[in-house]
Regions:
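Short, Lys/Arg-enriched N-terminal segments with co-localized hydrophobic residues
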Residues: 23-33
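Alpha-helical transmembrane signal-anchor/signal-peptide segments
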Residues: 198-213
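Detector for intrinsically disordered, low-structure N-terminal pre-sequences
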Residues: 1, 23, 52, 73, ...
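Short, motif-level signal for alpha-helix interfacial/capping segments enriched in acidic residues
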Residues: 90-93, 97, 211-215, 437-440
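Solvent-exposed soluble domains appended to multi-pass membrane proteins
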Residues: 217-234, 239-591
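Transmembrane and membrane-interface helices of multi-pass
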Residues: 5, 35-202
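Low-acidity, Ser/Thr- and Arg-rich intrinsically disordered low-complexity segments
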Residues: 3-6, 10-14, 19
Length: 591
C-alpha cells in the first residue's frame, strides 16, 4: 500500500509540474509517468518473459516425456526460474556487449519441439508411421481438430526460439556454452537416435534376420464348404480397457461378446504395426509395415502400390473364389488404404467417397467420415447383398468411434449413454464396444452369420488419450477374438503379436497352411511357438530396426531403376510380301 501511495503521490507531483510547463512528459525527472513504472518489477524487461517461456517449455517437455500429469510443468518451470535468478541468467554481473549472433542450438531445439509435439499428440513416436504417411498420401485425413493444436505448437515454438536467441545474445555465458548444448540436444533426441540406429544397422548388419523367419502364405488344403469371413477392426480398442479396476465397465460389452468366443489375451504390438494401415497389414499379411523409403519409384508422388511383394489375406481368399468387400467410414484415399485393398484381391472398396452420397442424413458425419452406427447399418446391407450371391464371401470393416484423442461416439450412443463431454475416451470405448456387440447380435438374429467366422480385433494400441496414464501403467495388449459355429468358447493366454492373426484366422476358417505359419505369424490355435514367445518383444523390435531384406520383399517392384537407362533397341523394318508383289517379280530362269 505504501508503494502504491508513493507512486500516486509522485504521479500527482509530475502532473502539477507538467501543468506549469516545467517538465517534459516521460523525462527522467518524471519517471512515474513511464508505463513500466506501473508494472511489477519482473515485467519491466524482456528478461523474465524470455526465461518464463523457456521454463514453461522445459516443464512441458518433462511432463510429456514422463508420466507426470500436465500440471507437473509448474514445478519444473519454477525450478528453472529460481536457477535463473540465482545465476542472473540474462543479466550477468559483468555485462558484455550484446552480440547479434544466431545460436547453434536453434535447429536442435526445433527438432526437440517436433519430437515433443509428436509424443504429446500420439503418445509413442513412431517414425515408420511418419515416413509411411508422407509417402502414401495424407489427403482426406480427418484430423482437422489437430490443425489448431499444430498452429499453437508452432507459435509457441517460435516464441521459444526467439526467447533463447535473446538469452544467448545478451548473456555471454550462454554464448560460450550453447554450442555444447547443441551437440547434447542432437545426441539426445530419440527421433534422430532412431534414424541413426537404422542407418548404422544398414551398414553393419546383414539385415535379413526377419526375412529368414518369413514363410510365404500358402493354403495347402481347403474345407469342402469354406466359411464366410467378417473381420471387424475396432479402432484403437485395445484389450487393456478390460481391466475394470482402471477403466470400469468401458469394455464390458466386448467382454460379454467374448463369453461365446475364443478370446486371446497377450497379443502385443511390435514396432511398425502401431497405426491403422500398419495394424491391418500386420494382421492380414503377417508382416510389419516397413516404409518403402528409397525403394519408392517416385519420391514426389503417392504410392501406386502398397506392399506388392507379399501375398495377404485378400490374395489368398480371392484365389479361392471369395467375393471380398472393404468398408470404412473414412476416406480410402488416406494413407493408401484403397490402394492396398484393391491390389490385394478385394472386389469392392467402400469408403467415405462411395458411402456418403447415399446417406439419408448427409449432415450426420464427422471430420473423418461416417459415424459407426451409420456404417454398421450399411454393413448389414452389404452382407445381405453378399449372401444373395453364390460362393463364399469376406467383408473387412473398420470403425472410427475409438479414434484418439477423444473418439467419435455415434448418435445412438449419446442417446443411450447421455451427454459426451468431448474429452473422455472411456465414453467412446464403451460406445464402440456396444455398437460392435449390437451389430453381431443383429446379424445373428437375421441369420447372416451361418457358416461365418467373425473376427473382432483392434487395429492397434491407442495413441495418447485422456486415460493415457492409466493405460501405460501396466502391460498392454490388443483385442482379438473369434466367433464361429465350430469354435469352442475359451480364453487363451498367449505371447503373440498382431502378425499372428493371419495364420490364426486361416486355420480357424478350416484352411491347412504350411507349418501353421504365414508371413512372420504363427497360428495361435496350434502348439507352435510365436516369434514373441521364442525371442521376446525387445529382441524382435531390435531385429526389426536392422532389417532390410524383408523391406525389399514388401516393396518388390517399386525399386527405382539402377544405373543409366538401357539403349533403345534398333528398329527393324519388317517387309511383308503379298501375292501381288510376287507376281511382279521376274521368274527365275531354269537351266
Amino acid at each position: 500500500m505504501v508503494s502504491i501511495w508513493r507512486t500516486l503521490k509522485s504521479a500527482h507531483r509530475c502532473i502539477r509540474f507538467l501543468s506549469l510547463g516545467k517538465l517534459v512528459p516521460n523525462s527522467p525527472q518524471c519517471p512515474s509517468l513511464m508505463p513500466s513504472r506501473f508494472l511489477p518489477p519482473p515485467h519491466r524487461q524482456p528478461r523474465w518473459w524470455a526465461l518464463l517461456v523457456i521454463g514453461l517449455w522445459l516443464g512441458f517437455t518433462v511432463a510429456t516425456l514422463t508420466r507426470l500429469p500436465t500440471w507437473g510443468l509448474v514445478p519444473v518451470a519454477g525450478g528453472w526460474l529460481l536457477l535463473a535468478r540465482r545465476w542472473r541468467w540474462g543479466a550477468p554481473p559483468q555485462p558484455h556487449p550484446v552480440r547479434r549472433v544466431w545460436p547453434w542450438s536453434l535447429l536442435p531445439i526445433a527438432l526437440w519441439g517436433l519430437y515433443v509435439y509428436l509424443a504429446d499428440s500420439f503418445g509413442m513416436v513412431d517414425l515408420g508411421a511418419v515416413f509411411f504417411h508422407l509417402q502414401a498420401g495424407m489427403e482426406e485425413h480427418g484430423g482437422g481438430e489437430r490443425i489448431g493444436a499444430a498452429i499453437l505448437y508452432t507459435l509457441s515454438m517460435l516464441l521459444l526460439l526467439v526467447s533463447f536467441t535473446w538469452l544467448v545474445r545478451v548473456d555471454h555465458r550462454w554464448r560460450l556454452a550453447e554450442r555444447l548444448l547443441a551437440l547434447a540436444l542432437l545426441a539426445g533426441n530419440p527421433m534422430l537416435y532412431g534414424i541413426g540406429q537404422r542407418g548404422a544397422a544398414i551398414v553393419t548388419e546383414d539385415g535379413a534376420w526377419l526375412e529368414r523367419q518369413y514363410v510365404e502364405p500358402v493354403i495347402l488344403e481347403a474345407p469342402r464348404d469354406p466359411p464366410n469371413l467378417l473381420l471387424l477392426y475396432l479402432e484403437s480398442l485395445e484389450r487393456t480397457y478390460a481391466d475394470r479396476e482402471r477403466f470400469g465397465d468401458a469394455y464390458a460389452h466386448l467382454e460379454a461378446l467374448g463369453e461365446k468366443a475364443v478370446v486371446f489375451e497377450g497379443v502385443r504390438q511390435v514396432d511398425n504395426t502401431g497405426w491403422t494401415m500398419a495394424g491391418m497389414i500386420a494382421s492380414q499379411c503377417g508382416t510389419p509395415l516397413m516404409p518403402a523409403g528409397l525403394l519408392h519409384d517416385s519420391q514426389f508422388e503417392p504410392l501406386g502400390k502398397v506392399v506388392p511383394g507379399v501375398d495377404c489375406l485378400g490374395d489368398l481368399l480371392d484365389a479361392r473364389g471369395y467375393s471380398l468387400t472393404y468398408m470404412g467410414g473414412a476416406s480410402t484415399r488416406f494413407a493408401g488404404k484403397g490402394v492396398f485393398y484393391r491390389d490385394h484381391g478385394f472386389d469392392r472398396v467402400l469408403g467415405r467417397e462411395e458411402l456418403e452420397p447415399g446417406l439419408e442424413a448427409p449432415d450426420y458425419v464427422n471430420s473423418w467420415g461416417l459415424y459407426d452406427d451409420t456404417l454398421y447399418d450399411l454393413t448389414v446391407e452389404e452382407m445381405r447383398r453378399l449372401e444373395r450371391q453364390d460362393g463364399p464371401w469376406g467383408l473387412v470393416n473398420l470403425s472410427i468411434t475409438g479414434h484418439a484423442p477423444n473418439g467419435y461416439p455415434a448418435r445412438d450412443c449419446r442417446e443411450r449413454q447421455g451427454e459426451f463431454d468431448g474429452v473422455d475416451i472411456l465414453y467412446s470405448v464403451e460406445c464402440s464396444a456396444w455398437l460392435a456387440r449390437r451389430l453381431v447380435e443383429r446379424l445373428e438374429e437375421e441369420g447372416l452369420l451361418e457358416n461365418t467366422l467373425v473376427v473382432v480385433a483392434s487395429d492397434h494400441l491407442t495413441m495418447r488419450v485422456s486415460a493415457w496414464e492409466q493405460l501405460v501403467a501396466g502391460e498392454r495388449d490388443n483385442t482379438f477374438m473369434l466367433l464361429g459355429e465350430q469354435l469352442q468358447p475359451r480364453r487363451l493366454e498367449v505371447e503373440a503379436s498382431t502378425m499372428d492373426l493371419l495364420p490364426t484366422v486361416l486355420e480357424a476358417m478350416g484352411f491347412v497352411i504350411d507349418w501353421h505359419r504365414a508371413g512372420l505369424g504363427v497360428s495361435l490355435l496350434s502348439a507352435e511357438p510365436t516369434l514373441v514367445e521364442e525371442h521376446g518383444l525387445d529382441t524382435l523390435n531390435a531385429r526389426l530396426r536392422e532389417e532390410t531384406a524383408l523391406q525389399e520383399r514388401l516393396w518388390e517392384g517399386l525399386e527405382p531403376p539402377q544405373g543409366p537407362p538401357p539403349p533403345p533397341e534398333p528398329v527393324v523394318e519388317q517387309v511383308v510380301e503379298t501375292p501381288k508383289d510376287q507376281a511382279l517379280e521376274a521368274p527365275e530362269e531354269l537351266p
